[in-house]
Amino acid sequence: MAGSLPPCVVDCGTGYTKLGYAGNTEPQFIIPSCIAIRESAKVVDQAQRRVLRGVDDLDFFIGDEAIDKPTYATKWPIRHGIVEDWDLMERFMEQVVFKYLRAEPEDHYFLMTEPPLNTPENREYLAEIMFESFNVPGLYIAVQAVLALAASWTSRQVGERTLTGIVIDSGDGVTHVIPVAEGYVIGSCIKHIPIAGRDITYFIQQLLREREVGIPPEQSLETAKAIKEKYCYICPDIVREFAKYDVDPRKWIKQYTGINAINQKKFIIDVGYERFLGPEIFFHPEFANPDFMESISDVVDEVIQSCPIDVRRPLYKNVVLSGGSTMFRDFGRRLQRDLKRVVDARLKLSQELSGGRIKPKPVEVQVVTHHMQRYAVWFGGSMLASTPEFFQVCHTKKDYEEYGPSICRHNPVFGVMS
């Protein structure tokens, strides 16, 4: 039975969890990764909380329902991509499986995703939950970066299918730059950038607040988020962009209409410089975070330069974008231009230092954008879980009972040949 039904693919992120069945192009559900629980009057530690489990255990909500429950305590079990509270995560998964996917877990193989540099212990915890609590027949824990690379095969820019590339995964909570060679993550070279979707939202909120436009204070964050998603884009040159707005403001300034949640009256805001200043913090992080000065193109270049020399050219040739915060218009084009400038400057310098005797071979820089970018990790999982090889590489319940949770510490790479 388990082999005949499609595997379930669950991608748990800091902000949102994407879930659905393998073989589909988009996840069936995208829900906030939060859980609303009734907190008892007594503050107890985790060990006691396990003892006190009972009726309270069933009284919880996840996703959008959790956000709409003001009388409950809303918790986010995942921070910066890593699961921090496994008790809450188990309850979260319970509703994911039974309420959203409406699946009988004994009948479906599961593909779960994990962030880069996840600890082997965390894989074991996940295996325990899936095999012990849900009794799944098979589990595969895939690295998000590898799935994002697989998803990029749908792009017209990609000639041959390869699992060598550099993944820029930018979600709500964190942006990672992850080099992958032949399907294996080069862990020592990963870098993270403390700028992601949430920071852009906060920055836009701050810009709007400074202008003192008539936004109700309790709605300022959601208004900033809506403006970010609807109107923001990446500009090629920030000085020219300011000039463009000053010359013809009517053409470029947009209007956002919102409704005051308390008195139901409309409010209208002009959205001007915020449109390009928001996402610009990827390339000029000092605008929002004075402690971090490196642009995303410099970080990508540094990561590639720290990798083994024989994979550097293939990495420059396959820079793959993944996650909702890479969806801004012209993000890929600007990144490719800036990265090419850095690389060309280095080649020019080496030529000058050699007195013109050495002419370096030009480096091809290509940033791959594709229409599956927003849910790239989930879609890559959906693709790979649809292949016959998936069932061969899955860790089965039988293996788990024989060897224990340590089998899930290692998950073989597959899918290059398919």
Swiss-Prot record:
The domain of life for this entry's organism is Eukaryota
Q: Which Pfam families match?
A: Actin (PF00022)
Q: Which cysteines are joined by disulfide bonds?
A: none
Q: Which InterPro entries match?
A: Actin, Actin/actin-like_CS, ATPase_NBD
Q: Does the keyword Nucleotide-binding apply?
A: yes
Which coarse location class describes where this protein primarily resides?
A: cytoplasm
GO MF annotation terms: actin binding; ATP binding
Localized where? Cytoplasm, Cytoskeleton; Cell projection
Keyword Nucleotide-binding recorded: yes
Q: Which SMART domains match?
A: ACTIN
CDD domains xref list: ASKHA_NBD_Arp3-like (cd10221)
Name the keywords, alphabetized.
Actin-binding, ATP-binding, Cell projection, Cytoplasm, Cytoskeleton, Nucleotide-binding
GO cellular component annotations of the record? cell projection; cytoplasm; cytoskeleton
What family does the entry list?
Belongs to the actin family. ARP3 subfamily.
Q: How does it assemble?
A: Interacts with the Arp2/3 complex composed of ARP2, ARP3, ARPC1B, ARPC1B/p41-ARC, ARPC2/p34-ARC, ARPC3/p21-ARC, ARPC4/p20-ARC and ARPC5/p16-ARC.
Outline what the protein does. Plays a role in the organization of the actin cytoskeleton. May function as ATP-binding component of the Arp2/3 complex which is involved in regulation of actin polymerization and together with an activating nucleation-promoting factor (NPF) mediates the formation of branched actin networks. May decrease the metastatic potential of tumors.
What name does UniProt use for this protein? Actin-related protein 3B
Natural source organism: Mus musculus (Mouse)
Instruction: Please name the gene that encodes this protein.
Output: Actr3b
